[in-house]
Amino acid sequence: MDKNTIIGFILIFWVLFGFAYLNHNRPIQEQLEKNPPMSANSVKKEFSNPISEIQSSDIYGNFAASTKGTETFVTIQNALMEIKLSTKGGRIYSVRLKKYTNYKNEPLYLFEGDESAFNIIFISSNNKVLNSEDFYFEIVSNSELETILRLNAGKNRYIDFVYTLHPDDYMVDWKLVSHNIQTELSHSMHTLNIQWMQKIRQQEKGRKFEERYARLTYKFLTDDIEQLRETKDDVRNVPNKLKWIGYKDQFFSSVFIVHSNFESAKLDSKYLTYGAYIKEYSTSTSIPYNIANIEPIKFNFYFGPNDYSLLKSYDKTKLKEQNLELEKLVPLGWSLFRAINKCLIIPIFNWLTNGENVNLGLAILILTLIIKIALFPLTYKSFISSAKMRVLKPQVENINIKYSGQEKALIRQQKTMELYRQVGVNPMTGCFPILLQMPFLIALFMFFPSAIGLRHQSFLWANDLSTYDTLIQWSTDIPFIPRFLGNHISLFCLLMSLATILNTRYNTMYQQNIGQEQFPGMKLTMYFMPVVMFFFLNSYPAGLNYYYLISTLITIMQTIIFRGLVNELNLLAKLEANKKKSKLVKKKFGFMDRLEEFQRKQQELLKKKRKR
């Protein structure tokens, strides 16, 4: 989890904590080491090596004829995507997602041409290294959904790359089929080494935010997923068996899946600061291989959106025995927050947005209302606790005056706790409902930046709810400002911050509880936090800031309604009645009694120290 997300959690915690006081108080094989992961420069160099430089059949054997040819292209496609295949290396040359565009409203290509490279390393019978990228494949068959590319090694000896699409599916089946090549390859070759590289294009308007969510992700064969660091260059040697390796952007991914397992991998993620690309990922890995085995080696590529429900569906279809768990590509937070998103937020959001011409702004409003209604009992309980503390304020002030001075601090606290016990008030009661709401706020904080349903959806002045909206934008380089604010001001973020200040002001006008006296800096902190949140959330999705805005406005409305419904004079009368009853029958309140007893012992210890 990156530091910006952690900072976000801290900000949310402090806002909730402050309002609580205001309202109450985780060995690469030798061959892999010889063939390290491909960088863009090395790939360009390798592809630019003319085949004419190497003519000797001593190196290529019966594959030598396939080193000569002309690169041609063939296309397979369905309603969702178009894949161009190259006869040079038999690789996927480009992938276009038909239903999506980039932030410039141009066709969305995950990669094209030399932005990606793919190579399989074979060992010939005379122990020479053969790279699939050096050969020209023959087009054996081609239909709209399937293409067979063949690497010939003489009469009736070949290796086929079979690419298959399915209607309305982002998953590509890829089979490596060997036929009568036992005499062409080394019998000591027990693994196939694979190299894969891809540059990640900038697809979204908010580059820095997109960089934060672009991560090289991989899944262990029988375990959970892990990621390389997203904020800087990272290289990792993974000796464990892997199930898949994913090149993830904020909203789209390229995932390489093997039906058996990857033996190990060297993974490399490079952070590209400028230009049309944000990251460069490369992998050097291997899979088990038996030259005598005539069964096809099966793989899959997933080229598509990071849609939680779509990715989850692959574990319920023909790939369910693979236990892919591709949905974990979507960052939804740690276990508790992820559970809230999986079980509550995502189902409600999908239900609200299921249909044509859905207004996403209205959907977010309804989602906010549903969450607020679900949390209403906790909110009301917190308000009542705050009201009790407020009506007891005069009596608490009398205790403070009667037992003023540092030497009587323990007596003062003891008498205050005794008052709370007598009237049946626990000063901590108001904190618990606020704290119980925190997981929902953090879950939503994680959900909105990952919600592809918001992408390119407009609402009011925001053209795209998945990125920041722009009230003011500038190109002038202002010292220090871009680091903290970017080159724009988000109107939704500004309104959210103003609403938070209004909420703070409204509460501080009426809340006069002990917390403000014990923590005199808390009031200033609560006014300062919306300013900090403005700088922090200014580049976050407009959908998230819109949610925070209406959530804060609803909170203000709730507080106004609660004040009108709760008669503080009647509430004080009930507390006084409880006080009279407590003088007749001493009632144990658990926490309050333990706190009072602790203070009494502290007072006795203090007296003993003074006598010494």
Swiss-Prot record:
One of its GO terms (cellular component) is plasma membrane. It comes from the Bacteria. The chain crosses the membrane at residues 4-24, 329-349, 358-378, 434-454, 484-504, 524-544, 546-566. Pfam families: 60KD_IMP (PF02096), YidC_periplas (PF14849). One of its GO terms (biological process) is protein transport. One of its GO terms (molecular function) is membrane insertase activity. Keywords: Cell inner membrane, Cell membrane, Chaperone, Membrane, Protein transport, Transmembrane, Transmembrane helix, Transport. Its main location: membrane. It is found in: Cell inner membrane. It is a multi-pass membrane protein. Required for the insertion and/or proper folding and/or complex formation of integral membrane proteins into the membrane. Involved in integration of membrane proteins that insert both dependently and independently of the Sec translocase complex, as well as at least some lipoproteins. Aids folding of multispanning membrane proteins. Belongs to the OXA1/ALB3/YidC family. Type 1 subfamily. Interacts with the Sec translocase complex via SecD. Specifically interacts with transmembrane segments of nascent integral membrane proteins during membrane integration. PANTHER family: CYTOCHROME C OXIDASE ASSEMBLY PROTEIN COX18, MITOCHONDRIAL, OXA1. This is Membrane protein insertase YidC. The gene is yidC.
